[in-house]
Every structure is written in structure tokens, then in C-alpha cells.
Amino acid sequence: MKCFLICGSKKEPISINGTPNVVKSKYFEGDVKVRLRDYETPDEEYFEQSNDTCSIMIRGRFLPTESTLTADDILFGNQFEKPLRDVLPMGSNLLMKGLQYVDPSIEFDLYCDQPWAFSPFFATMTKMQVSDALLPMEYFEDHSSRRSQMQQQVIRQESSIDPNKYILADFCNPFFNPSTLSISIPYTKMSFSIKNYYNGQPLRYFCKTRDGNVIFAVEFDL
């Protein structure tokens, strides 16, 4: 398992459960840290407090742009370079329905030539804090109603992103385990290995603007 941060033309290794990587782009500056449960170098302090199997933690601020960005303008999710329709396992539709239950704002097309699944960044992040200064990249709880509020497009469109505020966001879940290449379908007891369906493509999580400008990406070479 290898992991990389892609920012512009740069592609650099990510030390899983290690030191965060710096992100500096036109739209965002900050850090990204990837954690995996049961990886070679464990992060016991984080996973002792969580039942999640993976975490992409993002810290920093969105930068000023010519036009004011709103919470509806930033997306986060997956995109593939080649079709998946011939290798998708049985249960894929059930998996996506489960994901829609967790994140009603997700949109996807798994059967096109470049399959994708994206949600608004501020709606899909599992946990998030906003502060006037940088927060430590540690485990934290989020009991706010932010996720349910941000599922509503009108609220996202009315929520301007303040470039003077710092976010700490954690995209974490117990459903996907990159270390074992297994997926659990949310709120069911069903799980399956994707090893037999893997066609060699890297798994990439993109943070991008709604009009298609990539801010950064985290790549897992499975």
C-alpha cells in the first residue's frame, strides 16, 4: 500500500500514520494527514478513540478568490480514469444506496467512462471544526448539526467561505479498509473484498471546485 498527495503538478509520498503533508494551491493552504487502522506504523492514540478504519484529516483555510466561494462550490470524492462497469461486483447498487443514507448529498455515475462519486465538501466531511487559528491534527468529536444543515443546497449556497477562518475536517469511516481492500455496506452486516475486482487503478480522493478545478488529491495505490 502506497499513498500520495497530488497538488498541481507535484506528487509526493504520504507517510501513513506519520507526519502531515503540506498543501499549497490557488484555493487552499494547509495540511493533509492520512491514518489507517492496523497499518505498519499504528496511530494508537487516534484509533483507541474511534472505531473507524481510515481517516483523511484536512487542516487549513480556503484562500480568497475573484468571486466569493460558498459551501456549495467545493466538492470531495472519487474519480477514476478508466471504466469500472465491467468489474463492479454484485452489491454495488446496494453499497451506493447505503452511502446515500449516510450522505444524502452524494452524486455519482459508476457506469460512465470515467466513473465518479462526489459530495459537497462541507456536507460529506464526517467531522469538522472551524477556528480563528490552526487546531492540532488530533482526534476530536463533532456534535454539531453541520452535516444535516449542509445537506440542504440552499443553506450551502448561502454560506460563504471565510478565508480568515481555519477548518479541521476529518473524512473518516468504518466502511472502507484500504489495508485489507474490504468494504462494509453501511448499516448492514454485509461486507466483501474488492481484491478480485481490482483492475489496477489507483483510488483517488479529490478535493475540487464545482467547476472542475482540482485543489488537491489523495491517492491510494492499492
Curated annotation (Swiss-Prot):
Keyword Nuclease in record: no
Compartments, record wording: Cytoplasm; Nucleus
Gene Ontology CC terms: cytosol; nucleus
InterPro entries (alphabetical): Duc1 (IPR013897)
Keywords: Cytoplasm, Nucleus
Family recorded in the similarity comment: Belongs to the UPF0590 family.
Annotated protein name in UniProt: DUF1769 family protein
